[in-house]
UniProtKB/Swiss-Prot annotation:
EC number: 2.4.2.1, 2.4.2.2
Keyword Transferase appears in the UniProt entry: yes
Catalytic activity: a purine D-ribonucleoside + phosphate = a purine nucleobase + alpha-D-ribose 1-phosphate; adenosine + phosphate = alpha-D-ribose 1-phosphate + adenine; cytidine + phosphate = cytosine + alpha-D-ribose 1-phosphate; guanosine + phosphate = alpha-D-ribose 1-phosphate + guanine
Protein name: Pyrimidine/purine nucleoside phosphorylase
Originating species: Cupriavidus pinatubonensis (strain JMP 134 / LMG 1197)
Alphabetical list of SUPFAM superfamilies matching this protein: RmlC-like cupins (SSF51182)
Function statement: Catalyzes the phosphorolysis of diverse nucleosides, yielding D-ribose 1-phosphate and the respective free bases. Can use uridine, adenosine, guanosine, cytidine, thymidine, inosine and xanthosine as substrates. Also catalyzes the reverse reactions.
Entries under InterPro entries matching the protein: Ppnp, RmlC-like_jellyroll, RmlC_Cupin_sf
An annotated Gene Ontology molecular function: thymidine phosphorylase activity
Top enzyme class: transferase
Pfam families xref list: Ppnp (PF06865)
Domain of life: Bacteria
Family statement: Belongs to the nucleoside phosphorylase PpnP family.
Length: 105
């Protein structure tokens, strides 16, 4: 899933701001109708709810993640990814700014 750029896309100009600016992303729209968000999460512990399934690809930084229904935290860093089921949630702990791509399923 690792690519360095996305070609022939549209980018929504307005940023998605969550948790008082602790998470900032922009939506990228592809010609086939799929979408992704490119964003950063600043140091915090946050809980995200999902509608569609998501694949979170980490570009830079390190995070700890706990999926809904799990007691265990998993650590992910640059070049790694984790899957989140649809209609679910996950906790994420970030100590230094995290750069990510969210792929929607």
């Amino acid at each position: 899933m690792e690519v360095s750029q996305f070609d022939n896309v549209s980018v929504v100009k307005k940023a998605n701001l969550y948790f008082d600016g602790k998470c900032v992303s922009h939506t990228v729209l592809f010609s086939d109708g799929t979408r992704k968000t490119l964003g950063v999460i600043f140091p915090a512990t946050l809980t995200f709810n999902t509608g569609a399934p998501e694949i979170m690809e980490i570009n830079a930084g390190v995070c700890r993640v706990r999926l809904a229904g799990s007691e265990a935290w998993q650590t992910y860093g640059a070049g790694q990814q984790f899957d989140v089921p649809g209609n679910s949630s996950f906790d994420i702990e970030v100590q230094e700014t995290l750069d990510y791509v969210c792929h929607f399923g």
